[in-house]
């Protein structure tokens, strides 16, 4: 009887530990476009993560579901926690590894990758990056963002076009 009680207690404890180990998804990162600038709003990421620092951001031109060309890559200084980052911006203490602003075009599909360090309460690394998909329309210098459904339709059309011989 004691053995069964101990077994049940262990299983209950194991189930509780597994429930605590569930990771949560990173928040959505809003993208803003206008006046020839594209910015990523990092405030939701900073607000919903523990002791986070943004380490690297990159943007690539996407064709279908694959990155075809990297347009911008920046390494940010330790402890960087700004609430917003402008694509192709230059920030004090950062290293811009690649910058091709002329390749950011209307009617393009893009992914922004935000790499960060977040420490849990036990000082273990948890989630380390988030990808943000966005599509531009309009005229150069007067960009507009497409809604998610239109961007998804564009990605699917590009994917199908790439499959044809």
From Swiss-Prot:
Would the keyword Ligase turn up in this protein's UniProt record?
no
Q: What is this protein called?
A: Type VI lipase immunity protein Tli3
Q: Where in the cell is it found?
A: Periplasm
Q: What are the entry keywords?
A: Periplasm, Signal
* Major place of residence: periplasm
One GO CC annotation: periplasmic space
What is the role of the protein in this entry?
Immunity protein that neutralizes the toxicity of the P.aeruginosa antibacterial toxin Tle3 in the periplasm to protect the cell from fratricide intoxication.
Keyword presence, Transmembrane helix: no
Q: Note the subunit structure.
A: Interacts with the Tle3 toxin.
Bilayer-spanning residue ranges: none
Phenotype upon gene inactivation:
Growth of mutants lacking this gene is affected in the presence of various P.aeruginosa attacker strains because mutants cannot resist Tle3 toxicity.
Please give the organism. Answer: Pseudomonas aeruginosa (strain ATCC 15692 / DSM 22644 / CIP 104116 / JCM 14847 / LMG 12228 / 1C / PRS 101 / PAO1)
User: Which residues, if any, are the signal sequence?
Assistant: 1-21
């Amino acid at each position: 009887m004691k053995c069964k009680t101990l077994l049940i207690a262990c299983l209950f404890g194991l189930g509780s530990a597994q429930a605590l180990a569930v990771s949560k998804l990173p928040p959505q990162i809003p993208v803003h476009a206008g006046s020839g600038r594209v910015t990523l709003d990092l405030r939701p990421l900073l607000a919903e993560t523990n002791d986070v620092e943004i380490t690297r951001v990159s943007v690539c031109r996407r064709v279908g579901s694959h990155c075809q060309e990297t347009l911008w890559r920046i390494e940010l200084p330790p402890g960087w926690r700004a609430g917003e980052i402008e694509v192709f911006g230059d920030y004090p203490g950062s290293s811009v590894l690649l910058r091709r602003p002329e390749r950011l075009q209307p009617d393009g599909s893009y992914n922004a990758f935000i790499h960060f360090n977040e420490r849990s309460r036990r000082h273990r690394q948890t989630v380390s990056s988030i990808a943000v998909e966005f599509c531009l329309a309009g005229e150069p210098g007067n960009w507009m963002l497409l809604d998610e459904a239109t961007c998804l339709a564009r990605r699917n059309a590009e994917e199908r076009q790439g499959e044809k011989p």
